[in-house]
Amino acid sequence: MAMNGISSTASRSSLQSLPDAPQPQPTGADSPQPASSPSTPGNSQTLTRMARDARPPLAGQQQAAAANAKGAATGASQLNIDDKGHVQHERVLLKTAAGRETISPKIERMEMPKVNGLIIHQTNSPSVSSTLNSYALKGANGAHFLIDKDGTIYQTASLKRKTNHVGRLRSRCAQEESCSPQEMKLNQKHDPEGESLRESKKPVGDRFPSNSDSIGIELVGMAYKAKSHQETSNLDGSFNFLITTTDGKMLKYENLSADVAIRMREEIKESKNKDNYSVFEQVTLQQNESLRWLTQQLRREYSIPESEVFAHPTVSRKAGSEALTAQWR
């Protein structure tokens, strides 16, 4: 979740994955570079190793998503949700290894009688512990689940309760290019509060899922301001990025599909040119595996179509790299 373009579990007063964009041919400085010619000699071994060790892209998952045809997940849910709205399953923990309870009453709000969608976030915090600390603050906001970098899933709020994890809604018809002429004119006024209010009055399916009817899933991951980046391309058509942050960190992104790479270049530009705009680190393989399992189970439990699962920046105005590398299909 983001504030001023950066995700934050501690402050979400105006709590966006960019919609899937067409894939223009990148040009100029942002064009992908061959793996054999990194621009900085000191990083050549790192970039070469990234290309050599690259795992194949997630084409199989994309095919599975197409086969699913946006329908509700089939089969029975394994979650076994109790009367408190807590999941009783060995893969979903209610305590940390140190014995700390993860259900955080201070982020729970009113009763949530119906679940219509899932929203995927990144925390902009370095650990489970720091996220739980923020959830313990007075007036804290947060999501229902938290997935650590090693793939461990924690439940942090009752599934019977709303949490403030979405923020102001973006116009769904604007992103799907289906607005009426009147609504197109209203959206051009750039009034996020008014836009969100109009959206909230629409029926399910005509608007994005909101705080009132969605489950939030957070992935532990930091966001950093980009200073520069290099790219390599793999034989399978995927891309690797090496981003240098303004505080000297090196962030690696491996096996990004062509469309994600295009969007990542856009996010890097934004981070370089705008204050308080950062790029989120790549979601880990373990997190994505757990995310796929959890979203499948939740979709089965609540009969949620695949078309109602979104990364946070799609539904609200957030940094576009938040959950950009998340894989739930």
Which residues does each PLM region occupy?
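Low-complexity, intrinsically disordered export/secretion signals at extreme N-termini
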Residues: 2-72
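Short, low-complexity, polybasic intrinsically disordered segments
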Residues: 317-329
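N-terminal pre-domains immediately preceding structured catalytic cores
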Residues: 45-46, 50, 56-105
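Acidic/histidine-rich, metal-coordinating catalytic segments
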Residues: 304-319
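Active-site-adjacent loop/helix surface patches within enzyme catalytic domains
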Residues: 80-303
